[in-house]
């Protein structure tokens, strides 16, 4: 019988050759058994009974989500070679083999007041996503961060009877702990990437899965990681002065509210070269309005290389703060938005944690200085940047804090570990 099974398996992923099937039956079966095995083989090879490829629908709404989703997709394809992947995201997801329905640069909206102004657009995007998922009918929908959008999407996915996996928890521990009830109701499996999130969800009796942080993978596997400062300068046509990197974010609102304040530092440090880390979703035209009075170079597609070679960095709050820490470049964390005093009041009212940067949250103490809202001004930026640009106590303490954070994050390989977990969990849903 083992020979028969081996022959049948040959046909699993190939067009059915009926004459050869009959030959197998005649060669390996006799008498009454011949009829039984013929029936079993034809049933096994019938198209509707053959194993269908798994269909994964992935939704990421910003550059960091695009990065993590792309590495997750690579892991899914490694362990499930026939996987079909479709979703909302960016260029990195597309390069990893995902069919992109809508790019995140057309959907990303941030800030309290900006969201209120764009409610109609948000509703239209949710409905478009809804219809596409129903039409494609995936085996699972994997939501990646981007809680404001994805938790709304999760509601109708659940109603449609499609398993909902959440990869990279929305930061409800910072903004809205009340959403835990919603997550418990709508999300079948939660996969978190920060160790403190395991304890957070445990307080609400909601088990989650943790396998490390995918940023460690992305940075560990980055190209040019052995590049020297002089090589980087030569390739990019820079002056050779020490570099101060400006990581101003990947969304237009971030450029509008943060980049102009970062650029006030240019005149204070003539012995350094300021370089903007160009976001993949942006073009020169997006940066041009802010560079009319200052001469600053923009380098696209090399953020890790730039930050690694920089003497210091000014970084918009978010994933980039942790990336900068893993790369061991001293930084000042920057965050601002429209609305002035009103936004600051809303910010202080709704933020539930002591720190906003991931570096400080993971460390459980202040490792990097955070300049938020009204505190993000020229005077404060000058003071904090001056403290870390040269050798000294502040710089040394920050680098030591980075070492603590990196130890807590653990080893590389998280993306593949999460992919394996998801495939195993999904197999349980399929029975």
State where each predicted segment sits:
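Nucleotide-activated sugar donor-binding and catalytic core shared by glycosyltransferases
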Residues: 7-10, 43-431
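Active-site-proximal helix-loop elements at catalytic-domain edges
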Residues: 13, 22, 61
């Amino acid at each position: 019988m083992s020979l028969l099974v081996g022959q049948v398996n040959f046909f699993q992923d190939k067009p059915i050759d009926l004459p050869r099937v009959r030959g197998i039956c005649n060669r390996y079966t006799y008498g009454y058994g011949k009829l039984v095995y013929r029936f079993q083989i034809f049933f096994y090879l019938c198209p509707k009974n053959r194993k269908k490829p798994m269909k994964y629908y992935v939704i990421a709404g910003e550059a960091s989500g695009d990065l993590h989703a792309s590495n997750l997709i690579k892991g899914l394809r490694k362990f499930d070679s026939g996987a079909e992947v479709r979703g909302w995201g960016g260029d990195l997801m597309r390069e990893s083999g995902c069919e992109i329905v809508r790019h995140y640069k057309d959907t990303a909206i941030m800030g309290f007041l900006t969201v209120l102004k764009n409610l109609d657009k948000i509703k239209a995007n949710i409905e478009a996503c809804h219809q596409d998922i129903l039409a494609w009918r995936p085996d699972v929908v994997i939501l990646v961060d981007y809680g404001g959008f994805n938790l709304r999407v999760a509601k109708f996915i659940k109603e449609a009877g499609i398993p909902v996996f959440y990869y990279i928890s929305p930061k409800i521990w910072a903004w809205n702990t009340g959403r835990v009830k919603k997550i418990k109701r709508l999300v079948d499996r939660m996969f978190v990437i920060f160790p403190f999130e395991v304890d957070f969800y445990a307080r609400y009796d909601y088990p989650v899965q943790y396998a490390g942080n995918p940023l460690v993978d992305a940075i560990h596997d980055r190209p040019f990681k052995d590049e020297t400062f002089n090589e980087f300068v030569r390739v990019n046509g820079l002056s050779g002065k020490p570099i101060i990197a400006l990581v101003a974010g990947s969304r237009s609102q971030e450029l509008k509210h943060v980049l102009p304040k970062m650029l006030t530092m240019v005149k204070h440090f003539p012995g350094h070269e300021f370089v903007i880390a160009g976001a993949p979703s942006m073009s020169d035209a997006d940066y041009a309005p802010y560079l009319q009075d200052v001469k600053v170079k923009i380098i696209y597609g090399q953020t890790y290389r730039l930050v690694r070679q920089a003497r210091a960095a000014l970084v918009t709050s978010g994933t980039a703060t942790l990336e900068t820490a893993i790369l061991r470049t001293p930084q000042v964390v920057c965050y601002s938005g429209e609305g002035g005093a009103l936004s600051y009041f809303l910010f202080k009212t709704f933020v539930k944690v002591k720190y906003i940067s991931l570096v400080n949250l993971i460390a459980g103490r202040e490792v990097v200085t955070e300049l938020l809202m009204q505190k993000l001004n020229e005077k404060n930026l000058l003071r904090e940047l001056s403290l870390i640009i040269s050798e000294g106590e502040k710089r040394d303490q920050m680098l030591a804090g980075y070492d603590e954070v990196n130890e807590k994050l653990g080893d590389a390989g998280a993306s593949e570990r999460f992919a394996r977990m998801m495939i195993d969990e999904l197999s349980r849903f399929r029975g």
